[in-house]
């Protein structure tokens, strides 16, 4: 267990944990990732928070992240609206755009595929207390038993999650599970559920 007294210590610990978790993710290998990701997708599409949602706000997976494409395809097959993020340059904000297929995506910030900034497809994020049934699918390097996550350091989901009125579901492989608490900072916001495969 770590005892931290200053913000700098927390920052160093977070960076070290990110490096370690990134290495763990890479060591799983393509076949192991594919098996785990299929199991995760199968659990997500049967999860009550997902089944109840009319709108699915999800990341587009890249690299060794848990693959979200099967979840997205399932959402489309059920008539759900799917929105994916576009990073707002120079900020830690995301705008969410409706997609109906994987065509027309462009290379965005951090090498991540993003939707085009089409005002006609810009989605309003349902805030706390709204009647919209929505779920957010959230990436991370690691998750703990309280739903706290270790993200990538940009703060995008730390800004997004408090403004989101639906349920949030973090995705991770079993190797990404943390026995140690991951709520390093006051602004860290846990997800409602974590699906591990």
Which residue ranges define each predicted feature?
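Internal, well-ordered alpha-helical segments in soluble enzyme and binding-protein domains
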Residues: 17, 40, 156-157, 190
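Short linear sequence motifs
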Residues: 43, 149-150
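Short glycine-rich anion-binding loops that position phosphate/pyrophosphate groups of nucleotides
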Residues: 62-64, 141-145
């Amino acid at each position: 267990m770590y005892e931290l007294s200053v913000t700098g210590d927390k920052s160093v610990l977070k960076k070290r944990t990110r490096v370690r978790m990134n290495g763990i993710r890479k060591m799983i290998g393509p076949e192991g990732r594919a098996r785990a990701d299929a199991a995760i997708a199968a659990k997500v599409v049967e999860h009550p928070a997902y089944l109840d949602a009319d709108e699915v706000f999800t990341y587009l997976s890249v690299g060794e992240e848990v693959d979200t494409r099967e979840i997205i395809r399932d959402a489309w097959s059920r008539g759900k609206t799917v929105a994916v993020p576009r990073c707002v340059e120079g900020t830690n904000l995301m705008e969410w755009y409706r997609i109906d297929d994987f065509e027309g995506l462009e290379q965005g910030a951090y090498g991540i595929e993003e939707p085009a900034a089409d005002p006609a497809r810009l989605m309003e994020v349902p805030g706390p207390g709204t009647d919209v049934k929505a779920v957010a699918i959230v990436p991370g390097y690691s998750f703990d038993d309280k739903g706290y996550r270790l993200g990538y350091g940009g703060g995008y989901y730390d800004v997004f999650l408090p403004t989101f009125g639906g349920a949030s579901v973090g995705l991770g492989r079993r190797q990404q599970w943390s026995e140690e608490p991951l709520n390093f900072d006051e602004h860290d916001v846990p997800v409602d559920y974590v699906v591990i495969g």
